[in-house]
């Protein structure tokens, strides 16, 4: 066990209420007008719910935690403009929920904080413009029509184009700060957005030099994410976010390999961690190695300035796939190589295989790191030979060996003051895509158990 495996923000006390495994979070009904494709005689109950994108400890109350929604209920859809997403609750705004574990183990929702732009207007979950994080994902409305600037008129690429939202967000990572504000990472930009306690945007950091909203200024220059982060895959952005105990450094992890320079990197087991010091502006970047290319990193919680708990899973339902994996690793960056300092890497290496590119980052044999690793898994060993060391990871919890966890996703980890870890699944608003259409999200192959947001607890061994 690490020396301080605690919620670093919470004073030690004896008031920590126990978690009953699998306790349900409360939800309401957002929509009940669509047919449930699995059982056409029934209605699809879209639940809100959806507080499973991430979790974070309340800064002072050891029994409270924050949980995050994503962009809202949506499904894969192919319409008149091609493949995209159908937004089944089009006016949905992403939000943060504050929850409390009561003495009897039940969970109470205390409040919701709707995310808003700098003018105090609720943001949507619609995609961003192409230049600022969009991937040309087409949004469709509940009738299957393209969502346009003027919904009263038909689509026209010149006079009435597809609607995007400059401030639209697909939230995935959450850091709750001691001052009551929040940093959120998303899957569009990726963007890192700082919200005040009321959910109004204060600051923003992303990879786009032309975005005037990047207003975290250090020594006269805006802080920007490394340029290669703009090559994130659709729906595979900055899935995880935390802040170090000193409240100085944001730490984010990408869900999967990025499209760097293109889709050829998707077969890689490489993901990237970024550390952003909000005080001095220093940005560091480290390489993380997944157990398998099909796995994803999905949550992070800081233990110290160099150690973190990070979730890794395979998106499989344990009740349907006996080989499913749900894991918590401890990451240690103390011996890892900062690959963001490209000039230093180049200057300190006499190896002609190492090159640097301002848009693609570190290159090996003129290939991006994603391409290099996708080409041969043994290339991880070559990186070490070149003096480029990935993050060290040690298994802390094999969740499926420790508890009954029937969910496909593991996206929220809540570090508690006794060293335990609260686990929160993403229920996708209790809905899922299927060959027949949109249906409830079922945990079992017979489609009898509907998924829902539930809280679990595990005890790490390191």
Where are these regions (language model features)?
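Sequence/structural signature of beta-propeller domains
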Residues: 5-462
């Amino acid at each position: 066990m690490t020396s301080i495996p605690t919620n670093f923000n919470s004073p030690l006390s004896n008031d920590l209420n126990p978690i009953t495994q699998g306790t349900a979070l409360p939800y309401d009904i957002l929509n009940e007008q669509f047919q449930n494709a699995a059982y056409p005689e029934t209605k699809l109950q879209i639940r809100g719910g959806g507080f499973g994108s991430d979790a974070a400890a309340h800064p002072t109350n050891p029994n409270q935690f924050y949980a995050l929604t994503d962009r809202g209920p949506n499904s894969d859809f192919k319409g008149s403009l091609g493949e995209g997403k159908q937004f089944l609750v089009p006016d949905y705004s992403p939000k943060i929920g504050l929850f409390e574990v009561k003495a009897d183990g039940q969970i109470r929702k205390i409040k919701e904080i709707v995310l808003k732009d700098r003018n105090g207007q609720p943001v949507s979950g619609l995609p961003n413009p192409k230049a600022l994080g969009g991937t040309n994902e087409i949004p469709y409305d509940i009738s299957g029509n393209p969502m346009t600037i003027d919904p009263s008129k038909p689509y026209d690429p010149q006079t009435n184009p597809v609607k995007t939202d400059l401030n639209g967000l697909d939230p995935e990572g959450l850091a709750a700060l001691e001052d009551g504000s929040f940093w959120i990472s998303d899957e569009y930009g990726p963007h890192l957005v700082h919200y005040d306690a009321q959910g109004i945007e204060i600051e923003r950091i992303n990879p786009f030099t032309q975005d005037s909203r990047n207003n975290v200024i250090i020594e006269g220059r805006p802080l920007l994410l490394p340029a290669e982060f703009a090559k994130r895959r659709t729906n595979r952005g900055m899935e995880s976010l935390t802040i170090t105990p000193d409240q100085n450094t944001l730490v984010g992890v990408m869900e999967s390999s990025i499209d760097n320079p293109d889709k050829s990197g998707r077969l890689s087991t490489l993901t990237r961690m970024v550390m952003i010091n909000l005080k001095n502006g220093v940005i560091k970047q480290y390489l993380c190695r997944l157990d398998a290319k099909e796995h994803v990193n999905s949550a992070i919680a800081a233990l110290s300035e160099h150690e973190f708990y990070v979730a890794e899973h395979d998106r499989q339902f344990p009740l349907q796939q006996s080989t499913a994996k749900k894991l918590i690793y401890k990451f240690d960056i103390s011996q890892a190589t900062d690959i963001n300092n490209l000039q230093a890497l180049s200057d300190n290496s006499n190896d002609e295989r190492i090159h640097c590119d301002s848009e693609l980052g570190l290159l090996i044999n003129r290939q991006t790191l994603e391409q290099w690793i996708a080409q041969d898994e043994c290339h991880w060993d070559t990186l070490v030979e070149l003096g480029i060391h990935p993050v060290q990871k040690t298994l802390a919890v094999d969740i499926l060996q420790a508890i009954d966890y029937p969910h496909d996703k593991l996206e929220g980890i809540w570090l508690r003051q006794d060293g335990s870890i609260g686990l929160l699944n993403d229920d996708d608003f209790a809905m899922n895509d299927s060959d027949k259409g949109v249906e409830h999200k079922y945990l079992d192959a017979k489609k009898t158990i509907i998924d829902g947001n539930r809280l679990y607890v595990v005890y790490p061994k390191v």
